[in-house]
């Protein structure tokens, strides 16, 4: 975009800002804006295979930034799309590694996921236990969340209680139902109509189990359906709060100051659709530009 603008408007002054909403590129956006470094961690990929992933360190090593997509992203599964089998286990490994490094705050970006496990894999990686009706422990995936009978949070790594965890979430969908995780995002992850219904029933059962485990129903909290219901998992299993990812990034890079005298703001969206009206980068940028919400 920069080259095109300078070609057609030779006298224009341009400034490029790395902007992401919690999905791919978010770690680089923070590091580019604030300085920092990447830390490589060996974790599990969406199919429980070993891979090298990473998290970013900013604010003099006090804050870690994690992209869910870096180890549970859709590009990692290539032609093996199947949200019944993929896991967020690696995300939990990244969160635990960052916490053990001594950071005070962890920012987790949701988006671009290949999963629909409600964050169960990530939870299992940090010590949360899931049991089926026979009392057998297992690590749920999208296709087996329907088998969850009980959740035990007592074994969760204690160090996580000493770290502030913030989740960047760019959509406001609930856990399940017509506008939930499975129905809205399942098809892009490889789910056909029958599979969507199966996944949705699984997330509904997970919601029941979460309610029993933490004593409250979070299924309608905006954003709990994000990234295959990972939003719900971040609240229930990690004690995190959800906030608009784009708001977090733009505030961090002091975007308002940068555009105070701008005539135009050019941003992008992989596909302009109904989700663009629910907090995507292209709309949130304009909201901030004009000082009011655009719908």
Regions found by a protein language model. Name each.
Residues 287-294:
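Conserved small/polar residues in nucleotide/adenosyl-binding loops
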């Amino acid at each position: 975009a920069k080259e095109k603008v300078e070609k057609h408007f030779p006298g224009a002054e341009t400034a490029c800002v790395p902007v992401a909403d919690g999905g791919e590129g978010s770690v680089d956006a923070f590091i580019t804006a604030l300085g920092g470094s990447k830390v490589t961690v060996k974790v599990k990929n969406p199919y429980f295979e070993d891979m090298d992933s990473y998290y970013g360190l900013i604010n003099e090593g006090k804050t870690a930034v994690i992209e869910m997509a870096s180890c549970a992203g859709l590009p990692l599964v290539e032609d093996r799309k199947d949200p019944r089998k993929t896991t967020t286990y690696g995300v939990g490994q990244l969160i635990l590694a960052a916490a053990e490094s001594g950071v005070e705050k962890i920012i987790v970006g949701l988006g671009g996921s290949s999963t629909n496990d409600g964050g169960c894999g990530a939870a299992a990686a940090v010590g949360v236990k899931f049991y089926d009706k026979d009392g057998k422990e297992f690590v749920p995936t999208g296709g087996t969340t329907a088998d969850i009978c009980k959740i035990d949070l007592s074994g969760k790594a204690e160090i996580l209680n000493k770290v502030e965890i913030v989740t960047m979430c760019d959509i406001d969908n609930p856990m399940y139902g017509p506008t939930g995780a499975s129905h809205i995002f399942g098809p892009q992850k490889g789910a056909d109509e029958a599979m969507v219904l199966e996944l949705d029933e699984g997330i509904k059962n997970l919601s029941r189990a979460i309610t029993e485990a933490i004593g409250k129903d979070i299924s309608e909290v905006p954003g709990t359906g994000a990234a295959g219901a990972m939003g719900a998992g971040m609240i229930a299993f990690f004690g995190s709060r959800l906030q608009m990812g784009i708001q977090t990034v733009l505030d961090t890079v002091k975007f308002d100051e940068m555009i105070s005298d701008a005539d135009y703001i050019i941003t992008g969206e992989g596909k302009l659709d109904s989700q663009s009206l629910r907090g995507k980068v292209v709309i949130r940028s304009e909201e901030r530009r004009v000082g009011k919400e655009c719908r």
